[in-house]
Amino acid sequence: LTAMKKEIKFSLVYRDMWQSSGKYQPRVDQLVRIAPLIIEMGCFARVETNGGAFEQVNLLYGENPNKAVRAFTKPFNEVGIQTHMLDRGLNALRMYPVPADVRRLMYRVKHAQGVDITRIFCGLNETRNIIPSIKYALEAGMIPQATLCITHSPVHTVEYYAHVADQLIEAGAPEICLKDMAGIGRPGMLGRLTKTIKERHPEVIIQYH
C-alpha cells in the first residue's frame, strides 16, 4: 500500500495460535493447505513461518519440525514473499540459554530451510543477548531484525529505546521491530520513537509488532 508517498508493507504474524488451546494448533498438512490462500490474498510481503513455539508444536504432534518448516516456507519462497521467524536471542527458540555454537548452527539451518528474516528479541532489551544473534544471522545469510520490547515506565523513554536501537543497528541490524507484546505502547511515544530512529538511521526499516 502507498500512503503519504510512503510504501507500507504488511507482515502476517499469527504466532500466538501456536500457544493457544490444542484445537487451534495447526499441523503441517494444514499449514501447507492454507499457504496458497495467504498468497492469493495478495497483501502480505512477509509471513512468519517458524520460530518461538512453532517447532515445539510440531514435536508434540510427532512431526519433524525441520520438514514442517521447509514445507510451509516453500510456497512463499516460490512467489517472492519473505518468510520470518521469532528468535529469543540468548535463548534461541527455547526458554533458557542456548550455547553460542548451537545458536550459530541454528541460523545456518534456518537459512537452508528457506527462512529469510529472524526477529531477535530479549524481554529486557539487553543488547548483550541480542547482538551475538545479529552477527550469527548475518553470517548465515539471513536478515536480522533486532527488536525493542515496548513498555511504559519512567525509565522507558524515547531516548532509552533510541539508544538501544543505535547499538543494535551499529552491530549490523538493518531492521528494527517495535515489539508491543502487551499492547500498551502509546501512539505518541511510538511515533516519536519511530521518527527519532529514522532521523538517525534513514536507511533502516522499522516494523511494528
Which residues make up each language-model segment?
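N-terminal amphipathic alpha-helix/helix-capping segment at the start of soluble metabolic enzymes
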Residues: 1-21, 69-74
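Active-site beta->alpha loop and helix N-cap motifs at the rims of alpha/beta catalytic domains
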Residues: 36, 51-169, 183-186
